[in-house]
Amino acid sequence: MNRRSIALLGSLLLAPVARATPDAAESRETRATMGEIFRAVAELLPPSLDAKRFADPAHHDAILAALTKLSTGGAKLEAHGRERDAGFGFLSRSLARDTEEIRRRYAEGQTEEARFLFHEVTQDCVACHSRLPSPRDASLGRRLMLEEQVAALPLDERARLEIATRQFERAETTFEALLASPEYRASDLDLDGALDEYLEVCLRVRRDFERPARALERFAARADVSPRLRARVQHWILSLREIAARKRAATPLAEAQELLAVAQDRTRFPDERDALVYDLAASGELHRFADATPAGPEAALAYFRLGEIESRVGRSFWLSQTEAYFETAIRMAPGEPFAPQALARLQEFLVSGYTGSGGRQVPADVQTRLAELRGLVERARPAAPPPPTPARQVQPPAAR
């Protein structure tokens, strides 16, 4: 089974929305939509775990009907996301696009492609649920975790399922078992992102610094940890304890700026990956600030900083939020000093995604969007003052 089990997707949508919106009715509608999506996924889960059953014509009509419900629910969630913070909006748009793509491919007979995409779309879920603190775990998720099929998942898949179902304390415990397991090589855990995901849960969601420091000390003591990885983990352990001991700034945005100043200090962190803990801690503060501040120059600055961080720490080939953060910063405040920087970073990010074309193969719709954003920034730029009028020179009278 794919490392991102389909069960992740089904459970993601059990969770309440990350922040209560001002309109309680809208919040209820969002939860109802998530329930619709979950029920569709519950129908799809059993056949999706068996490639032959998923492709069996005897099950075609039932699977297509469930995929249609899933796609419809994704479209509804996208509509709700327009009224939410930019991060939720981006992820709900991504979910809507992906679920419709799955339905279309299955309807066209591309059953294995649809099944693969169904597995991969879980990144929408994990990305959304690991942004903000959670006051409690979700009861529906707890019940799902008791399923025999779920309990038998490998540790890495189970940990990601627990994130998607908002079982964050369980996810911490499962990740710690994963980091200690001799069945997984230390280098693979690093390359596969398990260390990063564990720290995301601890810092962004649980806001816990000492527990991961102890877990990383145990991981660093493993015999198969390379000297370079051990040195990196030691950087992370020191950073965790420094942040836990420091005096917080007055606001989340100010706190994030201070943490980022350390993360970007290349005299201390010549390799930017060594600064992961400071980056993740700063991103947690920025998410909290953006969640509470839906608009304005400071919110735009928060999204610009999130784009910078995501460009350094993002791992997903399937779902990169870098583009969404930079674009949100530009649209929200095109006249701010950081907007041209956001535009330059966005252009670099998008063009590099289409190499080795050297940018010549950037799709027309992407070029159109970049041109629109460039126009926003240029129109918002203060007009240059006119050059001073030269003083009129008085000619001396002609000599007689």
Annotate the PLM regions.
Residues M1-A7:
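Bacterial N-terminal signal peptides that target proteins for export
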Residues A7-A15:
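Bacterial N-terminal signal peptides
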Residues E26-T33, P47, G87-L91, D98, ...:
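Acidic, polar-rich low-complexity tracts and alpha-helical solenoid repeat scaffolds
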Residues D61-A107, E112-H119:
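Extended surface/linker regions that mediate inter-domain or inter-protein docking
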